[in-house]
Structures are given as C-alpha cells and as structure tokens.
C-alpha cells in the first residue's frame, strides 16, 4: 500500500513531474497529458458509480477504477529503464475480461437501429460522459505511443473500456426508460 505523508513536494513547481523510474517529464508533454487524461477518466467513472448506486447486477466499475490507476502507473513507467522489470502493466487477461463483460451485457440488448444520444437520465448521461472521457484518454495514449514505446495492452484496454461503457449505458437505458435515438436533421422536421 502506498503511504503519502506529505501531499506537496514543490518538485513540480518547475513544470515537471516525476515518473516511476525517477526521471522527470514536462507536465505539458504527451506522457503526462496521457496520464492526466486517464486520471480524468477515472474520476468520470467514479461519477458514474455514484449515479448507478441504486442499480444492481452491473459490472464492477470499482475494479475498473483500480485498473485505470494501474494504467496510469503503466504509462508513468517508461520502457527501457531499470524499473521495467517491476513495472505495473496492463495485461491481456484484463482486456479479455472487459470483452467478456461487453459480450454478456450486449447479449440481452436489442440491436442498434440508430445512433443514440448520450441522454435520457443522469445515470445514462454519466456513463456516456465517462465513455467520452475514456476516448479522450485513449487518443492521448495513442499520441504517446506515436512518440515513445508504450504497452499495447494499455491502448487496447482504453479502447475496450469505452466500448464497455457504451454498452453499459445501453443497459442502464434499457432499465431506465429507454434510449434517446438520434434524429437526423431531415427527419426532425426543423
């Protein structure tokens, strides 16, 4: 367990932040942008958990929050360092478990007949918001991967997680009054 006795260190006052291997990276760089986006995604998943508290039988989003923390640690550990052998990395079984959860949730849903809007209730919208923020985290991680070596399972995890949240939002909508379908301009009568 990590113990933090002091929250501020002043070491980041120069615009850098420490990585797992002890090196420092600029806060506006691609690595820390990706780590920050994953942190924001984790917060959005936490908001979704709060909104879904009254519903039962849903996948364990608390586990996903822990895995997003792991993913941030993964991105904070550059490849090719002495710390790599002990790095916390996202692994294929984590991605595969998310895929199984997607398949299980999707099995009970009607096929999509239209694009759906991220609305209908606070719970539905909160899951869609988390999905969109996870997509942004994925784009930031892909930008990091274009610049430096990253764990490809971490990229796959983010990609699947956004799909997972999309299907979860559909499950919540099915329990919570139905999906709000997109009506293209010509069909709205505007």
Located regions from the model:
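Phosphate/pyrophosphate-binding loop motifs in nucleotide- or prenyl diphosphate-using proteins
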Residues: 1-190
């Amino acid at each position: 367990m990590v113990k933090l006795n002091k929250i501020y260190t002043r070491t980041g006052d120069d615009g850098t932040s420490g990585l797992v291997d002890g090196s420092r990276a600029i806060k506006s760089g691609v690595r820390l942008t990706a780590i920050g986006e994953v942190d924001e995604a984790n917060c959005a998943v936490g908001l979704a958990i709060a909104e879904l508290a009254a519903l039962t039988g849903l996948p364990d989003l608390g586990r996903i929050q822990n895995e997003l923390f792991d993913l941030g640690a993964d991105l904070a550990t550059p490849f090719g360092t002495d710390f790599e052998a002990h790095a916390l990395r996202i692994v294929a079984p984590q991605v595969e478990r998310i895929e199984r959860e997607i398949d299980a949730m999707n099995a009970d849903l009607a096929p999509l007949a239209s694009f759906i809007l991220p609305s209908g209730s606070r719970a539905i919208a909160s899951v869609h918001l988390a999905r969109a923020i996870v997509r942004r985290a994925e784009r930031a991680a892909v930008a990091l991967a274009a610049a430096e070596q990253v764990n490809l399972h971490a990229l796959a995890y983010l990609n699947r997680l956004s799909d997972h949240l999309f299907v979860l939002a559909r499950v919540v909508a099915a329990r919570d009054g139905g999906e709000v379908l997109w009506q293209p301009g010509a069909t709205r009568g505007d």
